Amino acid sequence: MIDFGNFYSLIAKNHLSHWLETLPAQIANWQREQQHGLFKQWSNAVEFLPEIKPYRLDLLHSVTAESEEPLSAGQIKRIETLMRNLMPWRKGPFSLYGVNIDTEWRSDWKWDRVLPHLSDLTGRTILDVGCGSGYHMWRMIGAGAHLAVGIDPTQLFLCQFEAVRKLLGNDQRAHLLPLGIEQLPALKAFDTVFSMGVLYHRRSPLEHLWQLKDQLVNEGELVLETLVIDGDENTVLVPGDRYAQMRNVYFIPSALALKNWLKKCGFVDIRIADVSVTTTEEQRRTEWMVTESLSDFLDPHDPSKTVEGYPAPKRAVLIARKP
């Protein structure tokens, strides 16, 4: 059973303590009623992983853990087999005692695009909305964050996160909660809030921006990364049934339109930090994610378009401040 007691004890002593008015009951309800049919299998994989304290831990340049003496072939095989029980691995990569998890996404590339534009993360309390397996949270800790809290309702991601955490020596500087942002009270407690790869899945994107703002302290920083299309401040794509084979894509604005949305929600100092086309080198099928990936979602005769005929995925990073 994945235990959230350490997180409750941690926030009981800091400025997130008011969250304890609602959080334990929400988690208890989740544990009682909402578990995926494979959750027991996934949580068993985490339980059977060995307790290891890394001799060398690098979260600044990657997510890498190494032992003082190389593990035996049998130990490595055990870790690899258990981690493969948690496939598909979408966000990473991870290098853990000789087991290299080559994930669908090169999330390190995204981090390299985002990091130069951030305010210094040293000592910050961070919320990562839609955090996936938690890769970027570990990189936030590597960049000096005091505490990274991720929320993502996908239960496989929770188990992947807990597996990595266990292999990082049960590191308590990052925590993942199986919640959506709509389940959070207006905490107004985080120095930096990240929302990366979430906005286009929201039926009401402006409501999502307000929800993000409600989590920030005054003067806090929002880091927003999402799909965009080319165009002026009035350009927004509303896809039909699917976009790049995804059913749950609702609004894809231009970067300039997104800037206006942020302004409408009361953010200031809004800047477009990066715009990049997603390549089939950054998102692809691997041994750790064996089903369809980006190359299958693009027009085989014109990779500048999706199979539905829309512009191929392009992503922007916008940085804004809550006054």
Swiss-Prot record:
The protein's role, per its UniProt record: Catalyzes carboxymethyl transfer from carboxy-S-adenosyl-L-methionine (Cx-SAM) to 5-hydroxyuridine (ho5U) to form 5-carboxymethoxyuridine (cmo5U) at position 34 in tRNAs.
GO molecular function, one term: transferase activity, transferring alkyl or aryl (other than methyl) groups
InterPro entries recorded: CmoB, Mo5U34_MeTrfas-like, SAM-dependent_MTases_sf
Protein name stated in the entry: tRNA U34 carboxymethyltransferase
Domain of life of the native organism: Bacteria
Signal peptide location: none
SUPFAM superfamilies given in the database record: S-adenosyl-L-methionine-dependent methyltransferases
Positions bound to carboxy-S-adenosyl-L-methionine: K91, W105, K110, G130, D152, P153, T154, I181, E182, M196, Y200, R315
Subunit structure: Homotetramer.
One record GO biological process: tRNA wobble uridine modification
UniProt cross-references to Pfam families, sorted A to Z: Methyltransf_9
Membrane spanning stretches: none
Reaction equations catalysed: carboxy-S-adenosyl-L-methionine + 5-hydroxyuridine(34) in tRNA = 5-carboxymethoxyuridine(34) in tRNA + S-adenosyl-L-homocysteine + H(+)
EC number: 2.5.1.-
Species this chain originates from: Escherichia coli O157:H7
HAMAP family tied to this protein: tRNA_carboxymethyltr_CmoB
Family: Belongs to the class I-like SAM-binding methyltransferase superfamily. CmoB family.
Gene3D superfamilies named in the record: Vaccinia Virus protein VP39
Keywords for the protein's UniProt record, in alphabetical order: Transferase, tRNA processing
Enzyme kind, highest EC tier: transferase
